[in-house]
Amino acid sequence: MSNGNIWVTDSLRMRSWTSWNPEIIVEAENSMYHASYSRVAGDPERVYVTPGTQNPEIAGRVSNNAYLEVQPVSMSANPGIVFYLPNVRSTTYSVYIVMVPATIVSTSYKAKPNCMSFTMGMANEKGKNVEVSKEWTVENNFTNDTTKVDTLYLGDVTFPMAYAGTGDYYPYLRVTSYVTSRMRDFQDRVMRIDCIILRPKELDDFLKEHPDYKYDDGTYN
């Protein structure tokens, strides 16, 4: 080179999540990433929450001061929504979803937990579209804590192909209410979703070992 030197190294003096493999945060209220709905009353609604309007008895904060409310088309219906997942790299992610309780701005509601199932859709090593659910989730169904803005760990998933820079071709996450008729008096079919987090597993492991580490370089969508 005419203007510098080149060295060969087997180690990069940086953490991958601060450069080529960032955390991805998909704000659920961003309609750009709504692929489809099922058994939903109208379009899901963006609901705003600020620190001033939030119920002080609910722990945690709603990211971006807004969440998505998904209403069932009837009292007996379990609604579902599919989210596109942008900028996914070929790596292993720890997947989280952040849920908001009904009492986030009011104490007049009786907060009931959601029960949900999740399915991830992606392309495999041969480029064929596949769906995975039980293979990558910790449990088949998940419930949230109604005393806080609750972050649920769904499990780890490995993407064999990268999608960043490929235009409108995305993997997706299907979120479906899973409340049986027997449980409808105790569980809520209305889903209030704050965001979806795809955290590189390397970062997830690091945060568990270093809980005071501050990381603010996630990619927000």
List each model region and its residues.
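Extended non-catalytic domains of envelope/secretory-pathway proteins
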Residues: M1, W7-V8
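Extracytoplasmic
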Residues: D10-N221
